[in-house]
Amino acid sequence: MEKREITGVQGQVNNIEVIFKEYYGSLCYFASRFLKDEEVIEDLVQDVFIALLEKKMLFQSEVHLKNFLYLSIRNSCLNYIRNT
């Protein structure tokens, strides 16, 4: 099984741009089920991608990555609702 590495260090595999383009729209749509403010939604989705880049995570498969992204944005939305 091929692992997908997410890093921001030059000279290493850097798939974050591809992943961002692939999932940004669907994550924003998913977040809109919880929140109505588009600016907040975009900020939360971007924060998830920043966390992904900063943590330099390694995923077993595309499914694991997708699950991480959707769970992260769900939790971010719920935290936002709880704190406002």
Where are these regions (language model features)?
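Conserved RNAP core-binding helix
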Residues: 20, 38-55
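Structural recognition of an alpha-helix C-terminal capping motif at a helix-to-coil junction
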Residues: 29, 43-50, 63-75
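Bacterial Sec-dependent N-terminal signal peptides
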Residues: 2, 19, 76-77
